[in-house]
C-alpha cells in the first residue's frame, strides 16, 4: 500500500527534518503516528499524500514509484486517498452537507444515495442540526467533524488524519475513533497523526513514532477489544460509514 525507503525531507535549503525514514503500511492496517508537535508528523503525511517531495529516497504508493509516475497520473493516485488536514480546507461557499457530499458527486453517486449517506454520517458526528450551515458559522470542532466526514464518506483506500481529535471532547474523540475503526474494517488503510498519548495508550493500536526526525515502529498489536469497550461505554451504534458496505476487509498486519 505505502512504502518509504530511506526518505529524507527538508524545506528549501534548510536541514533535513525527516531522516532515513523507512517503513511499509500493509493494506487494511491502522496505525497511530505520534511524536511531539514539531516532530514532523504533518510533513510525513504530506509526503504520503504526494503534497510534498522528498529530498531523497523512494516512495511507493499503491504499487507505483511516485518519482517515476507521470505528473498527469498523480491526481488519480491522490483521489484514492482521504485526507483530514489540520487546516480543514472546507469550501466556505458550500454548506456542511454539500462539503461532505462533494466526493460522492465527483464519483457520480446517485443523488438519493448521497442524501441518505451524507445525512446519516453527519448525524453520526453530531452535526444533524448543522447540515445546512456554512463552515464560517461553525466552531472549530464542528468544522473538523465536517472535514472528517468528507474524508471518509467515499471509503478511500487510504485515510490520513492529522490530529483529527484535536478540537473535540473525549467522548467525541472516542466516537470518531470508532468511526475510523469501522472504516478500517471495510478495508481502508488508516494513519492517524496525534500527540494525544493518553488516547494512544488507551486504544493500544500499532504506532509509528517520530523522534528527532527519525522513525521508531511500535510493536504493539491492535487492541480491538479496548476500542469496542471505549466506544460501547458511550452507548454508540455502528457508524453510518458502514451503510454502503460491500467490500471485504483485507488482512492487517
Model-derived segments and their meaning:
Residues 94-102:
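Short coil-to-helix segment of the ABC ATPase nucleotide-binding domain corresponding to the Q-loop/switch region
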Residues 66-82, 111, 183-185:
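ABC ATPase NBD coupling module
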Residues 134-138, 142-144:
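Conserved ABC ATPase signature
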Residues 49:
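Helix-to-loop junction immediately C-terminal to a conserved catalytic motif
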Residues 159-162:
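Catalytic Walker B motif of ABC-type/P-loop ATPase nucleotide-binding domains
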Residues 57-65:
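Conserved ABC transporter NBD signature motif
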Residues 155:
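Conserved catalytic motifs of ABC-family nucleotide-binding domains
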Amino acid at each position: 500500500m505505502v512504502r518509504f525507503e530511506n526518505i529524507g525531507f527538508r524545506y528549501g535549503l534548510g536541514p533535513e527534518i525527516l531522516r532515513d525514514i523507512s517503513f511499509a503500511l500493509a493494506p487494511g492496517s491502522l496505525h497511530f503516528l505520534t511524536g511531539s508537535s514539531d516532530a514532523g508528523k504533518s510533513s510525513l503525511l504530506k509526503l504520503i499524500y504526494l503534497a510534498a517531495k522528498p529530498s531523497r529516497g523512494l516512495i511507493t504508493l499503491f504499487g507505483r514509484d511516485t518519482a517515476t509516475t507521470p505528473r498527469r497520473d498523480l491526481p488519480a493516485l491522490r483521489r484514492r486517498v482521504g485526507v483530514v488536514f489540520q487546516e480543514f480546507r472546507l469550501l466556505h461557499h458550500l454548506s456542511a452537507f454539500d462539503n461532505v457530499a462533494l466526493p460522492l458527486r465527483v464519483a457520480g453517486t446517485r443523488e438519493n444515495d448521497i442524501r441518505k449517506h451524507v445525512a446519516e454520517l453527519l448525524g453520526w458526528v453530531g452535526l444533524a442540526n448543522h447540515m445546512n450551515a456554512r463552515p464560517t458559522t461553525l466552531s472549530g470542532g464542528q468544522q473538523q467533524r465536517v472535514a472528517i466526514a468528507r474524508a471518509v464518506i467515499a471509503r478511500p483506500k487510504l485515510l490520513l488524519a492529522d490530529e483529527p481529535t484535536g478540537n473535540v471532547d473525549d467522548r467525541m474523540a472516542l466516537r470518531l475513533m470508532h468511526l475510523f475503526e469501522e472504516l478500517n474494517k471495510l478495508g481502508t488503510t488508516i494513519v492517524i497523526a496525534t500527540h494525544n498519548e493518553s488516547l494512544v495508550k488507551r486504544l493500544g493500536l500499532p504506532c509509528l513514532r517520530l523522534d528527532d526526525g527519525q522513525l521508531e515502529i511500535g510493536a504493539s498489536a491492535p487492541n480491538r477489544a479496548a476500542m469496542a469497550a471505549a466506544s460501547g461505554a458511550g452507548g454508540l451504534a455502528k457508524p453510518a460509514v458502514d451503510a454502503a458496505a460491500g467490500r471485504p476487509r483485507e488482512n492487517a498486519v
